[in-house]
Amino acid sequence: MIVMQFPREEYFAPGHRGCAGCGAAIVARLLLKVAGKDTIITNATGCLEVMTTPYPETSWRVPWIHTAFENAAATASGIEAAVKALKRKRGKFADKKINVIAIGGDGGTADIGFQALSGAMERGHDILYIMYDNEAYMNTGIQRSSSTPFMAATTTSPAGSKIRGEDRPKKDMTMIMAAHGIPYVATACISYPEDFMRKVKKALSIEGPKFIQVLQPCTTGWGYPPEKTIEIGRLAVETGIFPLYEIENGEFRITYKPAKRKPVREYLKMQKRYRHLTDEDIERIQKYIDEKCKLLGL
């Protein structure tokens, strides 16, 4: 088996304020290992922004700008246009490929920042958008987002005898972005770092708008021990709850197919946000995932 050689350079410094076992920090570290120093980051308000930039400190060793919840993609669009103008009018960076990358959580991407993201994709800006998906507004107190999974409990979708947690299915952001007709979209998970890094490398080699949705388990919001972050992510993929695939120029491809999908029960039972589920609830979720996987060819 050929193992990918990870770059030794670190452009995401240690010492951030993230929780022990934080998945968002892994997203940033792996992303920058591929993107390298010639990168400009726009970062929406959220966990990653708050934990990496407590004034006057920063974990970012590349140019970085904090944006509001709603405009990371719009800011990246402006930076991309400015870089093009500087190259054209002043000859600056003429011999360099500058990577413009926007990063936002699921709340800042699928909800509050969706309009700006859709506009940036539709206009064809040469940017990469990374959605780090921890499936709720974790920074502000674990409120539900449109990326919160069906029946997961949050502070605004609590579980009780009548309401079984979140009552809506998780928004399929990657397929929504694919519907924009952009050249590259993909899903990834921090528990499969080689898959994620290959997708980042491919995305940055393609001209035009790109989108990658990265599942990153959250020890605080999901309710599991910090040392289980990678295991939880693997179970999300092995059960088919979060499939790994890419769509390049309209061509769909599964990038990891479990030899035999594990029961969703193994994934759900490890997390406190699902502790209210009955056997009937779990069977309902299993049926939904089975149908989804059949549609994708898993």
Curated annotation (Swiss-Prot):
Gene3D superfamilies assigned to the protein according to its UniProt record, in alphabetical order: 3.40.50.970
Gene expressing this chain: porB
Gene Ontology terms, MF aspect: 4 iron, 4 sulfur cluster binding; metal ion binding; pyruvate synthase activity; thiamine pyrophosphate binding
Protein name, UniProt field: Pyruvate synthase subunit PorB
Needed cofactors: [4Fe-4S] cluster
Reactions that this protein is recorded to catalyse: 2 oxidized [2Fe-2S]-[ferredoxin] + pyruvate + CoA = 2 reduced [2Fe-2S]-[ferredoxin] + acetyl-CoA + CO2 + H(+)
Cofactor: record remark: Binds 1 [4Fe-4S] cluster per subunit.
Enzyme nomenclature, EC number: 1.2.7.1
SUPFAM superfamilies, alphabetized: Thiamin diphosphate-binding fold (THDP-binding)
Entry binding sites for [4Fe-4S] cluster: 19, 22, 47, 218
Keyword vocabulary terms for this entry: 4Fe-4S, Iron, Iron-sulfur, Metal-binding, Oxidoreductase
Oligomer status and interactors: Heterotetramer of one alpha, one beta, one delta and one gamma chain.
Presence of the UniProt keyword Heme in the record: no
PANTHER family: PYRUVATE SYNTHASE SUBUNIT PORB
